Regions:
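Short, low-complexity, intrinsically disordered N-terminal peptides in bacterial proteins
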Residues: 1-23, 111, 159, 165, ...
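N-terminal auxiliary segments of SAM/dcSAM-dependent transferases
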Residues: 2-78
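Generic alpha-helical structural context detector
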Residues: 32-36, 63, 103, 129, ...
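Residue-level signal for pocket-adjacent positions within structured domains
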Residues: 45, 66-69, 75, 80, ...
Length: 323
């Protein structure tokens, strides 16, 4: 047990041993990180004994991590591209491979001055914010159903891109482009209500909504990009989750018996919301390339291709509304 007056290295050894016994991967790294969270110090640069408050904080963190709570939840943040996202219980932690999806999505917008972008099943908002980071002029709306996840989405929409050398645009106010020669855009009742209420400035606009019905609110042909990392695990895969993943929200992971229910809805209902030539960019599971590309082809999508992640696995499918 971590106790008052313990020296830093002894405390970290104690935590590492307990995490190792609990089966935590990277127990040495986690122990050092938990020490930093509890004390605000780097164990390599500190020799002051722990105070009672620090020891108690480290003991709580160790107990939670030993129960296989994700380290990112304990830290309260997760790096994505070159910015930090708020995370915690109730929202899916962004994965490094999803950065590939954000980059692929942004690349579809090359040459478009002020693209309109919709991020569905947004979670933390990592994809929508990633697109905004690559394309500062993009007008991005992020849609998330879960009330728990929406708390993090709203916070990230306000805070994640500040200090990144980009202008954080208040998308609730008419932009210079909207005032000039770009036609007024109708995002549907949800976002229009937010605009009317004059909410705080956001880099991207958070909206609470359901992928399975949100398409009904969208006008035809006014988006340049729809991006999504929907749930895609099968029922069988949900039974075999790693302990840390099992503590993330099932709502963000499970997609029916075959893992394709969200892709069916996207393929069937969202094409007309895009302008001709507009892009759909989807994260997929590493074994889903054939199934997802077939769904898109069956529903009249064009220019379908697959992009691999850093590990060489199929990770992203892109398609376009025919011109």
């Amino acid at each position: 047990m971590v106790s008052e007056a313990m020296l830093p290295r002894a405390a970290v050894r104690e935590v590492e041993q307990r995490l190792t016994a609990a089966g935590c991967p990277d127990a040495d790294f986690d122990a050092r990180e938990l020490f930093r969270l509890a004390t605000g110090r780097d164990v390599r640069l500190s020799d002051r004994p722990l105070t009672a408050e620090q020891a108690a904080a480290l003991e709580v963190l160790c107990t939670r991590r030993a129960a296989r709570e994700p380290l990112q939840y304990l830290c309260g943040s997760r790096s994505f591209l070159d910015f930090e996202l708020a995370v915690g219980p109730g929202v899916l932690c962004p994965r490094a491979d999803t950065e590939v999806v954000a980059q692929a999505a942004a690349e579809t917008l090359a040459g478009i001055a002020a693209p309109r972008v919709l991020d569905l099943c947004a979670g933390t908002g990592c994809l929508g914010l990633g697109v905004k980071r690559f394309c500062p002029a993009a007008q991005v709306t992020c849609v998330e159903k879960s009330p728990e996840a929406f708390v993090y989405l709203e916070k990230n929409a306000r805070c994640a891109l500040t200090g990144q050398g980009r202008q954080t645009e208040n998308v609730l106010e008419p932009s210079a482009l909207e005032q000039a020669d770009v036609p007024a855009f109708d995002w549907g009742p949800s976002l229009n209500a937010l605009r009317a209420d004059r909410k705080p400035a956001y880099a991207v606009q958070p909206v609470q909504g359901d992928l399975f019905t949100y398409w009904e609110t969208l006008p035809e042909g006014q988006l340049e990009l729809i991006v999504s990392n929907p749930p895609y695990l099968t029922a069988a895969e949900m039974e075999q989750l790693q302990p840390e993943v099992a503590q993330e929200p099932a709502m963000a992971l499970e997609a029916g018996e075959d893992g394709l229910v969200f892709y069916r809805a996207l393929a069937q209902h969202y094409k007309n919301a895009l302008c001709p030539g507009g892009a759909l960019v989807l994260e997929i599971g590493w074994q889903q390339r054939e199934a997802v590309t077939a769904l898109l082809a069956e529903n009249g999508w064009a220019e379908i291709r697959c992009i691999q992640d850093f590990g060489g696995n199929d990770r992203c499918v892109t398609a376009r509304r025919p011109k």
